Design a protein with these regions (language model features):
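N-lobe entry segment of adenylate-forming
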Residues: 1-55, 59-72, 149, 159, ...
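Conserved AMP-binding/adenylate-forming core of the ANL superfamily
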Residues: 39, 43-97, 114-119, 166-169, ...
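Conserved pre-ATP/AMP-binding loop-to-beta segment of ANL
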Residues: 39-41, 155-158, 172-193, 200, ...
Length: 315
């Protein structure tokens, strides 16, 4: 089983010894879900109402197969842009995996965006379809006329109002076994937008190799213990460090990832979830880390399995 394994004792040793040797036919969808035991747990998902579901690598493979076939049936072709505006829910990776199996380019967007931010990015990227959480459906409908390329809205759930398609219907309609689009490490994979601090946000087109760079980084900042880990980050899966450095890095190594779409950061609730789901490795924004440090005696009050915390975003 091929994996990026940059195991070195020092940065100098890594600089001397490491070289990128990527498969010529690399496709992240195949890498993330088809090389692992299909019964291995990929996701533990806790919903807004507290219900918990588990999703194996085989589950994600089959559902993304079906969604890829459905997207193809809607006229999505290789190279087309498909936006994903979904929080930490199983539909998020399923949508990205389906895009890459089809050869489409993902446009990860956060559910925290308002209508103007969504309008700019959907129009600028030329998104032909958007997979959207119900919480952003009204905003997308409000700006759809300003996004001339946007032919399809796919709303999470069993049903969708108006002209939108229901995600669950598409992700269960076809048979699994979709033949993935032939790709290489240089095949366009995702458009990710800059923050816009020096002007309008800029869409940066990344190739499939992006995810391997993120995996290599995670392998080191999670102390080379990724494969048997349970990973979690509070960051939205639209951001690079969360999507690539936690979710898909975990999938590359066959880890388990916790999906928990909370609206606010409650440090007591975070420790409780970490204990409940046996989280071993977590990537935290510095603000979140400081809030956790303000909790009294968490190791005594919670049965934690934490081994490694990583943080980035501030000096």
């Amino acid at each position: 089983m091929w994996q990026i394994m940059p195991a070195y004792d020092s940065l100098d040793a890594a600089r001397e010894g490491f070289a990128w040797e990527l498969p010529d036919d690399y496709n992240p969808a195949v890498d993330f879900v088809r090389k692992h035991d299909p019964e291995r747990t990929a996701l533990i998902a806790e919903a807004d109402d507290g219900t918990v579901s588990t999703h194996s690598y085989g589950d994600l493979d089959r559902r993304s197969d079906r969604l890829a076939a459905a997207l193809s049936g809607l006229g999505i072709d290789p190279g087309d842009r498909v936006a994903v505006v979904v929080p930490q829910k199983p539909a998020n990776p399923i949508a990205h995996l389906a895009n890459w199996k089809l050869g489409a380019v993902s446009v990860p967007l956060t559910v925290l965006f308002g209508p103007e931010a969504l309008e700019y990015r959907l129009a600028d990227s030329g998104a032909k379809a958007v997979v959207a959480d119900p919480g952003v459906r009204d905003d997308i409908d409000a700006v759809r006329e300003s996004c001339p390329a946007l032919d399809h809205v796919i709303e999470l759930g069993d049903s969708a109002a108006g002209e939108a398609h229901a995600f669950e219907a598409l992700a269960s309609a076809s048979e699994p076994g979709f033949e993935s689009h032939a790709s290489t490490p240089e095949t366009p994979s995702a458009i990710m937008y800059t923050s816009g601090s020096t002007g309008p946000p800029k869409g940066v087109l990344h190739s499939h190799a992006l995810w391997l760079g993120r995996a290599a980084a995670a392998y080191n900042y999670f102390d080379q213990e990724v494969a048997e880990a349970t990973l979690w980050t509070p960051a939205d899966w639209a951001w690079g460090a969360a999507l690539g450095g936690t979710l898909f890095a975990g999938f590359h190594y066959g880890a388990t990832v916790l999906a928990w779409p909370r609206e606010e950061f409650d440090p007591e609730a975070v420790f409780e979830r970490m204990a409940r789901h046996d989280v071993t490795h977590s990537f935290l924004p510095p603000t979140a880390l400081r809030m956790l440090m303000g909790v009294d005696d968490p190791a005594d009050r919670y049965d934690l399995s934490l081994e490694t915390l990583a943080a980035a975003g501030e000096p």
